[in-house]
């Protein structure tokens, strides 16, 4: 049965869902209709015969805003890096793999409106849909709150990944690579468990364990939980082919 056009309206239940999403990210948003559009995939709007009421235009805008923010941040934060290094870093950061991983970190997929076909085909976990949605979300933040607020949001999400890249000397997103490998081979997702925290609050080290199903695979340490998870994923990915689960 075809959806009614009224299904696209921002009902109280949907607004409550979006409010929870924003609360988790500590973001204020004025225009909830704009936010709702940013999280509406074309498969959903097509079922309503409202083909323009989806996130494609916001994705177009957000792509440019995101690139400018990342370029500006890299240029100002890493004055000793060459143009080639900065270009390589930017390409990695705004890649589909990196954007989809960031989207998973903030649970963005749970709030995307999808058509029945994409819903049944696990669209919430598709890298392309997630990457497009986070670009549209950045575009919506820019329109709603301005460039400064969009910059604060983007840098807050990506800064840890950028620092890890330069510290390691490579540009691989091990969490995304591991996620893809495990899902393809075992049809499940890896999980991360905080094992312990070491040291005082001003110099804390987080220790994380990585599991595939019930099987312990690796651990990692870092100055943040995300950094520890990335390091655990790096160890796991390099060892995975030698592990018989």
Curated annotation (Swiss-Prot):
Quote the subcellular location field of this record: Cytoplasm
Q: Which InterPro entries match?
A: dsRBD_dom, RNase_III, RNase_III_dom, RNase_III_sf
**Binding locations of Mg(2+):** 59, 132, 135
Q: What is its EC number?
A: 3.1.26.3
Query: Which catalysed reactions does the entry list for this protein?
Result: Endonucleolytic cleavage to 5'-phosphomonoester
Q: What cofactors does the UniProt entry give for this protein?
A: Mg(2+)
One GO MF term attached to the UniProt entry: metal ion binding
| Gene Ontology terms: biological process | mRNA processing; regulation of gene expression; rRNA processing; tRNA processing
Gene Ontology CC: cytoplasm
Residues forming the catalytic site:
63, 135
Domain RNase III, by residue range, is 18-146
- SMART domains attached to this UniProt entry: DSRM, RIBOc
- Where's the DRBM domain? 173-242
The UniProt subunit note reads as follows: Homodimer.
Family, similarity comment: Belongs to the ribonuclease III family.
* The protein's name: Ribonuclease 3
What is the organism of origin for this protein?
Borreliella burgdorferi (strain ATCC 35210 / DSM 4680 / CIP 102532 / B31) (Borrelia burgdorferi)
Give the encoding gene's name: rnc
